[in-house]
Amino acid sequence: MGVSGSGKSTLGIALGKTLSIPFLEGDDFHPKANIDKMKSRTPLTDEDRKPWLVALSKELLKHQSKGVILACSALKASYRELLSNSSLKELPFWVYLYCDSEELKKRLVGREHFMPLDLLESQLELLEEPKRALNLNNSQSINEMIEQIKRELNE
C-alpha cells in the first residue's frame, strides 16, 4: 500500500515472482468513471472508491486459498478495513511503501499512468499511515525489501 508512485506495482510484481504468488494490480479494477475522473485531475471521493474497494475485496476472497499480492493505495484505515473482509480466513499482511515527496514527483512525471502528478497532494493529504504494517522506505533495493518481507512473513 502507499500513494501513487511509491513502488507498489514494481515491488508486488517482483515479490510475486519470488514467492510464486499471483500479483494483482489494483488500478486494473477501477471503474472507467474513476479513471476518467482522475484523468481530468479530480480527486476521487470515498464514494468513488467504494465500488473499487468492494471489487478488490472480492478478488482477495477468490485468491485466499493460495494467496495473492495486491498493489493498492489503501490510503485510509477504513479502506484497509474494507479490504480486510471478515470472510477472509486470514487478515491481509500489509506492506506500506513510502518515500519523500520529491522522489514521488520524479516518478510520477516519468511514467504513463492515468493518475496525474496534480493529484499526488490529495493522496498525501488523505493518507492515514497504517498502525499494523511492515513499513518500508523504498529508497532500498527491491531485493532488500523482498528479504525484509520474507523475514516478516516467516516470523
Language-model features, listed with the residues they occupy:
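Glycine-rich phosphate-binding loop used to anchor ATP phosphates in small-molecule kinases
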Residues: E47-L91
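Conserved substrate/cofactor phosphate-moiety recognition/catalytic segment
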Residues: I13-A55
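Small-molecule kinase domains that catalyze NTP-dependent phosphoryl transfer to phosphate-bearing small molecules
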Residues: G110-K150
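Conserved nucleotide-binding/hydrolysis micro-motifs of P-loop NTPases
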Residues: H30, A74-K76, C99-E103, S141
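Conserved phosphate-donor/acceptor-positioning beta-strand/loop module used by diverse small-molecule
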Residues: L88-R107
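Structural signal for short hydrophobic segments within the conserved structured cores
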Residues: P22-L24, F93, L134-L136
